[in-house]
């Protein structure tokens, strides 16, 4: 995420925190090291803190729906990480579905549209990235997307896919409309990585 527009300072924060931890004599840090229960037992230490991380869901489960979105078999479905890694392979029309309603979907739409992608931004919220209202950035984020030509579709969930189209549904009336889509980027919910 720190490679996205406006988020470069985040990497410095992470680097600083890792540096601070590494300065402690009573802490050993094993980055990017998967551990099994037997590995943990071999370490023979009393206290272990595991930061296992999480992964973005790609099935559409989020705030508005606890059920996966059906009918997406003819559409390329990506996580935010996959979209960033494969930016040159994304097929338009692209839909970013923001049912997390934090900051990432807006930043991702900004990044992809600045790199020439045609983006439709669909969200059940009444504005883009409503959480950014807490940081007084919401209006700036939405204005930037509109200036870049991002099509913003608010107050709509994605009911299902149909071929290379998505059926959206108004959160108030239930009315349905169809939009073309070859690639959907799901910014809906993260699943914790809990396995050892």
Model regions: which residues?
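SH3/SH3-like beta-barrel fold
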Residues: 166-170
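Short polar/acidic secondary-structure junctions
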Residues: 158-159, 171-173
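Rossmann-like dinucleotide/flavin-binding elements
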Residues: 1, 30-41, 48-133, 172-183, ...
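Rossmann-like dinucleotide-binding cores of NAD(P)H-dependent redox enzymes
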Residues: 1-28, 100-157
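Residues that recognize and position ribonucleotide moieties
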Residues: 151, 159, 177-179
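A conserved short coil-to-beta-strand element within the FAD-binding core of flavoproteins
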Residues: 30-43, 154-165
């Amino acid at each position: 995420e720190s490679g996205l527009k406006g988020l470069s300072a985040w990497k410095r924060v992470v680097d600083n925190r890792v540096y601070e931890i590494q300065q402690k004599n009573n802490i050993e840090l094993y980055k990017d090291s998967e551990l099994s229960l037997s590995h943990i037992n071999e370490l023979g230490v009393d206290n272990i803190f595991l930061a296992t991380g999480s992964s973005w869901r790609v099935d559409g489960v989020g705030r508005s729906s606890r059920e996966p979105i059906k009918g997406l078999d003819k559409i390329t479905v990506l996580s935010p990480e996959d979209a960033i890694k494969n930016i040159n392979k994304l097929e338009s029309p692209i839909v970013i579905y923001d049912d997390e309603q934090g900051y990432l979907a807006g930043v991702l739409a900004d990044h992809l549209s600045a790199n020439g992608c045609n983006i439709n931004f669909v969200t059940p919220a009444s504005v883009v990235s409503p959480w950014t209202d807490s940081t007084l950035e919401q209006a700036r984020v939405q204005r930037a997307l509109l200036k870049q030509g991002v099509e913003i579709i608010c107050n709509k969930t994605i009911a299902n896919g149909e071929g290379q189209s998505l059926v959206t549904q108004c959160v108030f009336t239930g009315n349905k409309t169809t939009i073309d889509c070859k690639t959907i980027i799901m910014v809906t919910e993260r699943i914790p990585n809990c396995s050892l």
